[in-house]
A protein has these predicted regions:
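C-terminal catalytic domain of Rieske-type non-heme iron oxygenases
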Residues: 2-3, 7-256
Length: 256
């Protein structure tokens, strides 16, 4: 058993390598996001009608994205994503954010989804008519400048980590998707008796902002963050059919 990044890691093999040896370079790829300072705001499990390996493998490739997640073309450049292979079966995926699919026609003005992103940072979408591809770099600068005023600490993060999606798939069944002040932990678990079924867990973490910094800077968080729960939320469990029927959601991308 090992405690790292605010998580408890368990291995039941007495002959397994140490945690540090097993996770290898991924440790330095993840730890500067300060997961241990984040708090759980949502804990969900969906019961899926597929083998646990199938759903986990889906997150390791990007060929499906343009067909299954068409909205990503409006906020990410998935065709230029990079996939890195690590020892022990781990992989990483790096996706440019605050941009558009550069293999398609570049829009003259920010997309509707991108406009919402810009407005949430206090940026004017109208300033990016004819220069949509400048948004990503300007978002990096804006977040860097606003961080100390709004109570976030991005000192350990590189510029691209302020705009892009960094996803680390930890063999055999867990992945971590990282953003500057948010992380998604997702995990596939085998069904106890039926190999054609599994459980898919999604835990959402957020970095609580410093409210005192907001007051002293005379600025507001945009949008206002949801209140941080005082206690860990109870796990919400539902079925694949609940998601298909629109009764439950993990988020649009995971649902798809």
């Amino acid at each position: 058993t090992e405690i790292w990044a605010g998580l408890v890691w368990v291995c039941m093999d007495d002959d397994a390598p140490s945690f540090d040896e097993y996770i290898g370079p991924l440790k330095e790829q993840i730890e500067h996001y300060r997961l241990e300072e984040m708090v759980v705001v949502q804990d969900q499990t969906v019961h899926l009608e597929c083998n646990w390996k199938a759903v986990f493998d889906n997150f390791g490739e990007l060929y499906h994205v343009e067909h299954i997640h068409p909205q990503h073309a409006l906020i990410f450049d998935c065709p230029t994503s990079r996939v890195r292979l690590w020892k022990n079966g781990h992989t990483s995926v790096y996706i440019d954010g605050f941009t558009v699919n550069t293999r398609l026609d570049i829009p003259e003005e920010p997309t509707k989804l991108m406009r919402g992103q810009l407005e949430s940072l206090g940026m004017d979408p109208e300033e990016y008519r004819g220069r949509v591809l400048d948004v990503r770099e300007d978002v990096q600068k804006t977040r860097r400048d606003m961080a100390s005023q709004l109570g976030y600490n991005y000192d350990r993060l590189a510029d691209e980590e302020l705009s892009d999606i960094f996803q680390h798939n930890i063999f055999p069944n867990m992945l971590i998707t990282l953003q500057p002040d948010k992380a998604l932990l997702m995990r596939a678990r085998p069904h106890k008796s039926d190999p054609s079924k599994c459980y898919w867990d999604k835990i959402t973490l957020v970095m609580p902002p410093n409210e005192e910094a907001e007051i002293s800077a005379d600025l507001q968080f945009m949008p206002k963050p949801k209140p941080i729960p005082e206690e860990r939320p109870e796990r919400e469990e539902f079925t694949q059919e609940d998601v298909i029927a629109g009764k439950k959601t993990m988020d649009i991308t995971v649902d798809q």
